[in-house]
Amino acid sequence: MLGVRALFGIGLLVTSRGGFVLTHTRACSSAASNIYSKHLTHRPTCTMANTGVKYLGQEEAQQIDEELFSDFSFSVDQLMELAGLSCATAVAKGYPVTSLLKSPARVLVICGPGNNGGDGLVCARHLKLFGYEPSVLYPKRPNKQLFQNLSIQCQKMEIPFLTEMPEADLIDEAYSLVVDAIFGFSFKGAVREPFGEILSQLKKITVPIASVDIPSGWDVEKGCPDGIQPDMLISLTAPKKSAALFKGRFHFLGGRFVPPVLEQKYQLNLPQYPGTECVFQLN
């Protein structure tokens, strides 16, 4: 095992094993741009899109997921792979390797105990293939073969796993970006440790945060004004209602797997993805 500072030339232990419709067009947030500009050599182009995509409540989002698994015979790992690839693609579009001041382009991927965490593991693997240097923090690993397999895949690609959450100043020093894959749309109730402390540290960092589906700690429908404020949100399947409160620079839609009949049933009004793209920028 190595220390994070030793691994990155700076010390933490790591192991290499181990519904309503909203139509909006909004300019990229200048405040967010100022906060994160010191981590970029240039600001990526912000492509605007005007779309009337439907924003989902928690119950409706769960119903769509259940139908994908039951009526349409998708498997969990199948959708997880598509979702994780979408997340990595969105990150690559918003924060190209060549735009980051730090080299190599290190990304901290923080994974929760559920499917959102699985999306994060897939995202980390694809980020590695895209030329980034991801590290994974996975403090509560489920005892399920699917998640064990995803962890092994990362380990085989020499993606290090941290043993504890770095302090905010160390994250700012070592990383260019944090991917928040802790809690998804099914999250309810109070945040339990160690995730409470993790979210506390994330609120202190200055490097950009890219949240998967929901900013962790947010109410799926009401948001959380005192919670983390990501620079990027990657909504999966369709945005959730809390996404209307997102104030970051990049809002992407990912998970290009919704059958047309299901889209019509729930009146999702999904945008037309260009060409073979697996993500679509909503703001």
Swiss-Prot record:
Amino-acid positions noted as binding K(+) in the UniProt annotation, renumbered to this chain: 116, 180, 216
Top-level taxon in the UniProt lineage: Eukaryota
MF-aspect GO terms: metal ion binding; NAD(P)HX epimerase activity; nucleotide binding
Cofactor note: Binds 1 potassium ion per subunit.
Location(s) in or outside the cell: Mitochondrion; Secreted
Sorted UniProt keywords: Isomerase, Lipid transport, Metal-binding, Mitochondrion, NAD, NADP, Nucleotide-binding, Potassium, Secreted, Transit peptide, Transport
Listed GO biological process terms: lipid transport
PANTHER family: NAD(P)H-HYDRATE EPIMERASE
Subunit-level organization: Homodimer. Interacts with apoa1a. Binds to high-density lipoprotein.
Protein name: NAD(P)H-hydrate epimerase
Organism annotation: Danio rerio (Zebrafish)
Gene name of this polypeptide: naxe
